[in-house]
Every structure is written in structure tokens, then in C-alpha cells.
UniProtKB/Swiss-Prot annotation:
Belongs to the TmoD/XamoD family. Induction: By acetone. Transcriptionally activated by MimR. Effector component of the propane 2-monooxygenase multicomponent enzyme system which is involved in the degradation of propane via the O2-dependent hydroxylation of propane. SUPFAM superfamilies: Monooxygenase (hydroxylase) regulatory protein. The propane 2-monooxygenase multicomponent enzyme system is composed of an electron transfer component and a monooxygenase component interacting with the effector protein MimD. The electron transfer component is composed of a reductase (MimB), and the monooxygenase component is formed by a large subunit (MimA) and a small subunit (MimC). It comes from Mycolicibacterium smegmatis (strain ATCC 700084 / mc(2)155). One of its GO terms (molecular function) is monooxygenase activity. InterPro entries: MOase_MmoB_DmpM (IPR003454), mOase_MmoB_DmpM_sf (IPR036889). This is Propane 2-monooxygenase, effector component. It comes from the Bacteria.
Length: 114
């Protein structure tokens, strides 16, 4: 776990992230995500920051297996609060993209339109 750094920067960070409630479910989700390459966790008494480079993918089957109980989009919404990056909800996962262009195919954004 790392410490939070505050400040302002004008360059593109290529990062995305979400704040999870520090509950039994939130903790397991954070641990699963923290084991992935490029993902950093920052723990606070009531919340856990999950930050990643380019893309965070919360796979519901993977999280269901880790929890030992069903995990879906409604539970993700329940344990998460703030986020940064483009969030896309699908039936089997929630994804956060650092760049809206990377999310274009999921959100119906035409990169070639003028």
C-alpha cells in the first residue's frame, strides 16, 4: 500500500482508479485487484483506493470466486464511490479506462467523426 500524493499536473497520467469502501467485500475486491500488474492500492481507515495504468478490469467471475459468493455490477456500485477514468459496465465486468479513446468501442464514440 502507498501513501496518497496531492497536487496538480497538466500532462496525461494514463491512470484510472476507484475508491472502494473498506468493508469485508471491498477488501477482497481490492486484494484481487492489487495482485494485478500495474495496480496500486492505498488504504485508509474507511476506504481503499485502487489505481491502475491504462485499464482496470473488475471481472465478476474472478471476484465471485475470490469472495465465495455472487459478485455483480450492483455489488460493485454498492462498494464503490468516486472514480476517475471512463467507466464502462458490462454484464460480466466493470472496466475503467484512463483514456476515453480506449473506451470508444464500448461507449459508441466514433473516433473518425468530424
Amino acid at each position: 500500500m502507498s501513501s496518497m500524493q496531492f497536487g496538480a499536473a497538466t500532462e496525461f497520467s494514463n491512470k484510472c482508479g476507484v475508491t472502494l469502501m473498506n468493508t469485508p467485500i471491498g477488501r477482497v475486491v481490492a486484494e484481487v485487484m492489487g495482485a494485478k500488474e500495474g495496480v496500486e492500492l492505498t488504504e485508509y481507515p474507511s476506504m481503499i483506493r485502487v489505481d491502475g495504468v491504462k485499464l482496470l478490469s473488475f471481472d465478476y467471475d474472478e471476484l465471485t470466486e475470490a469472495l465465495g459468493e455472487e459478485f455483480d455490477g450492483s455489488i460493485f456500485e454498492e462498494i464503490s464511490s468516486t472514480h476517475y477514468g471512463r467507466m464502462v459496465h458490462l454484464d460480466d465486468k466493470t472496466m475503467l479506462f484512463a483514456s476515453p479513446e480506449d473506451a470508444a468501442e464500448y461507449i459508441g464514440f466514433d473516433l473518425t467523426a468530424k
